[in-house]
Amino acid sequence: MPEKYVAAIDQGTTSTRCILFRHDGSIATVAQFEHKQIFPKKGWVEHDANEIWNNTRRAVGEAMAELDISVNDVVSVGITNQRETTVVWDKNTGEPIYNAIVWQDTRTNDIAQRLAGDEGPDRWRKTTGVRLNSYPAGPKIMWILENVEGAREKAEKGDLLFGTIDTWLLWNLTGGVDGDNGNPALHVTDVTNASRTSLMDLKTLKWDEDLCKAMDIPQSMLPEIRPSIGDFRTVRARGSLAGVPIRGVLGDQQAAMFGQCCFGNGDAKNTYGTGLFMLLNTGAKPKWSDNGLITTVCYQIENQKPVYALEGSVAMGGSLVQWLRDNLQLIPNAPSVENMAKSVEDNGGVYFVPAFSGLFAPRWRPDARGAIVGLTRFANRNHLARAVLEATAYQTREVLDAMVTDSGVDINALKVDGGMVMNEFLMQFQSDIINTEVVRPKNIETTALGAAYAAGLSAGFWDSLNELKEQSTVDKVWKPKMGEDERKQLYSDWNRAVERTYNWEESTNEPS
């Protein structure tokens, strides 16, 4: 019997990939295409939504051709995407009226402040789960309607559609302007992506009418909200995946949770990418943070209650190593930072606080700026390299501590993924400073795997969450080796270093 596969479309910040997974969760093939990063002004980041759609088609076609398989060999397709990135397009032409505004973009800081008013960035957090800053999609839609000529009028007439990248891809995959087999294209999103807009009520999982009015966003623009795992219809009757059912849609960090099999209350994962993104499964009820975290939907299976999560994001992770390499030119390449860090016995009293654009969760100090603290003539570039890696671990502990406090759940192990998890020094130090096991899976492509798991589970390719957990394999586990006194001293010194960075920038904008 011919082997069957599940396809995952992984649309990220820098590239679009199609990965075909076997039944055992292993990767059969990968096709990847990068897209342009557009920086029109300081703090602005845009993508060409048409380029992303074209790259999606190319990646799917190349992956299918690489294995020389047909649509009959693909059971289902799942989609995972960069969250919050916002596309607004004309439903009559299929053309975006402006470039996609990327999640990193900070142009909406003023809009967010305007919305926050005297109540501050937490004004609607008990409804939406998110803070009012430049991250969520809602203020990005507002900016487009306020600044693109004719946009407001078209929106009021019902001619414009909004979507995060998942919605944009789904609309095109199901026919776009022409629809498919007499059906209009699908204009939908899933609960995880909708929870990043600042427009959805986390408890009802519906668009909040009062918030839409407050942001002056016509509800006719907004997609239908559906569970993450279920029947999203089939791909249009042309192209490399023609007729294949779309069965799973998840935002990238939630997909990584699903790929890490974080299905139980108290399961946590941290993704070490450009930034750091930690999520903690909090079960069937949303937990509201008193410690600077946001509340989000983790996933929802069709005909079941949603599962919620707490999330903390840190702006600088792997990008710190890039900064050492490209800006300071202290290291020849990214992998060399590990050997440099291991070449010294300790950090030499040096602490690096990477508050380049303020501090994110859980401190949320937009006034902070980066600093290197504790320098003496003894310190050298190896100490600085070590301090950079240690900063990543300290920031992770801050988020983890906040999660434990907010949830009341003890975290017995931290599952990790992302490019930096291959750095063994960092992983051991991470385990030491949080005094908890750190677990790296064999397959670190957990984001795409999560989309595949979601789609395959819905299609019956896998029978249950338990089956997925049983086939999940561990590559390595790090256990704490550091003594309690040393751990306390290091973390105390880190906190002193961080406090030195406060009140530097006069602007009160939220970091983004």
UniProtKB/Swiss-Prot annotation:
EC top class named in words: transferase
UniProt KW keywords: ATP-binding, Glycerol metabolism, Kinase, Nucleotide-binding, Transferase
Any one Gene Ontology cellular component term annotated for this protein: cytosol
GO biological process, alphabetically ordered: glycerol catabolic process; glycerol metabolic process; glycerol-3-phosphate metabolic process
Binding positions (sn-glycerol 3-phosphate): 13, 83-84, 135, 252
Purpose of the protein: Key enzyme in the regulation of glycerol uptake and metabolism. Catalyzes the phosphorylation of glycerol to yield sn-glycerol 3-phosphate.
CDD domains to which the protein is assigned, alphabetical: ASKHA_NBD_FGGY_GK
Activity regulation, short description: Inhibited by fructose 1,6-bisphosphate (FBP).
Full protein name: Glycerol kinase
PROSITE patterns: FGGY_KINASES_2 (PS00445)
Organism of derivation: Corynebacterium kroppenstedtii (strain DSM 44385 / JCM 11950 / CIP 105744 / CCUG 35717)
UniProt keyword Cell division present: no
